[in-house]
Amino acid sequence: MAETLCRMFQESVKKFADYPAMLRKVDGSFRPITYREMGDRVRGLTTALLSIGVTRGDRVALMSENRPEWAISDFAILHAGAVNVGIFPTLPVAHVEYIISDSGARCLIVSDQEQLAKALAVREKFGDLCIISMNAPRDGAESVLSYEALLRDGEASPLADHKYEECWSSVRPEDWASIIYTSGTTAEPRGAILSHQNFVSNYSTARKVLTFQQGDTLLSFVPLNHVFGRMVDHYLPISLGSTIAYVENLRRLRQNIQEVRPHYMAVVPRLLEMFEEGLKAAFTKEPRVRQKLIAWAFSSGRAMVEVQAGGSVGPLLTRKRWLADRLVFRRLRDRLGLDRLRFFFAGGAPVSRDTLEFFSAMGLPIMEGYGLSETSPLVSVNPPGRIRLGTVGRPFEGVEVKLADDGEILVRGPNVMQGYYKRAEETKEAIEPDGWLHTGDIGTIEDGYLSITDRKKNLIVLANGKKVLPQHLETLLLGSPFIFQAVLVGDRQNTVGALIVPAFDRVREWARAHGVEGHVGDETGFIEEPAVRRLIRMEIQRLTEGLADYEKIRAFALVDREFTLEAGELTPTLKIKRRVVLERYGHLIDSLYSDSSESN
């Protein structure tokens, strides 16, 4: 087994030289870049980085969307003995400035003009920051180095081979590979230090469980600056000789899926929910006879999923599921470009039970896993053929998991980070002397399968001392086709409340069908319609019927727009930033408890 990411890459370049490593969209079609070509580009860029003064241990920041240059830049940084500091391209200038300052990065590689503008703004405060632009620098961008020019110079350097070999071969397993800054849903980002050994241990154990293989094609969508995307869409497939196609952008995602026809996809739950919502909306436009056939097919598929979870499947149900696949699901998968897909690999947040069953019924199983930036990232996954819905699977080989007395999940293994960068005290709080990492997540373990119930910091403690786990309830609420987003509130209050973002398109369809025409085109007025509020109230009551009395949502407020990435309310993996939302909508939360009749 390779001991460093550099050695893993070199072995893959040699073993899979003429196979496609990456696919990128050029002139309307996806074109391949072979492992040999990728290796040549990594060698050229590594040599160029060394020539401009990058040395072992330097931090080099990388702010780019998913694209081949990101992958090449990452391996070049590592081969130079430097440390990759990933920065999400969606972050505003202030956040970029914070990460550059905190990490001490001496160089910043950016993708396009938008990222370059942020880099130049940051450099006004850090005058010695070296900037490399993947796209041609704009006029007037002085002292900005061209990625392509550096690459050409590096490849042409007569010392390239000697310097390159000497540098990457001296990288050690314990050397830092990356500083991963957490998304910060509850606090300011902290940099988790991950070594080559951390990453190598993680992909080495993951490939024993996940059925990835040479020749597979995946579509890279989860941000590569996120540790989940970094592992599942980058290191793991490269180690196996798979092919990585890069999504153009979110708007073209469905088109790209149809073009690439991936064998597997790493996804975040929100993407699956968007797919599900789109498909269900499309089903309503089918002729009535076809709608009945689709409903029967999903009923048969869900029945199969439920029986499989509990034991053996009888011949009658097997026959029904086969017929449903032939009449409905096979055509549907073909139309979506998912005919070759073996599974979705979901991480970052829990997937609702309804969504899990929906895709599993279609013959598209979702393998939920669990991990953190601090664990490189994978801790557990549902093994193929032994998926237990609603859990995040079993721990990987060599990774230990146990629960503290308060239910917090503790993890120990070779994947656990080296610590938080420049935060010795926080590192001591997070990692026990015997190596156990406090994850901050609360969970349960049954038959070796781990389930996540919530973040410890998100726990709502009511005035009577009762404790409520908001994530579980929020996931329940998302089971309604009329609820798009939900945030539970009620800390130190007598009852639980909720901020609800309606699924406006679906609610409008319902309103028109029920003769509710007022304010249909105006979100602010629309959410005040008594009929709309009654609909949401009934959905909340239906979905939370089985909860304990103290957990039930007694008051809610409707929000007139969705929480977005652009407004700073979502993380780059589309999780709601609870702290931001609670601060921004404090007036609505106050109204829940000052005048509950108004909110209900």
Identify what each model region corresponds to.
Residues 17-20, 155-181, 188, 211-217:
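Conserved pre-ATP/AMP-binding loop-to-beta segment of ANL
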Residues 200-217, 224-329, 340:
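Conserved AMP-binding/adenylation subdomain of ANL enzymes
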Residues 51-52, 79-152, 535:
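Structural core segment of the AMP-binding/adenylate-forming
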Residues 32-36, 168, 177-203:
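Conserved AMP-binding A3 loop
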Residues 395-462:
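Conserved ATP-binding/catalytic segment of the ANL
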Residues 39-44, 173, 192-213, 330:
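Conserved structural elements of the adenylate-forming
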Residues 21-75, 92-97, 146-152, 196-197:
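Conserved AMP-binding/adenylate-forming core of the ANL superfamily
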Residues 27, 114-173, 279-331:
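ANL superfamily adenylate-forming
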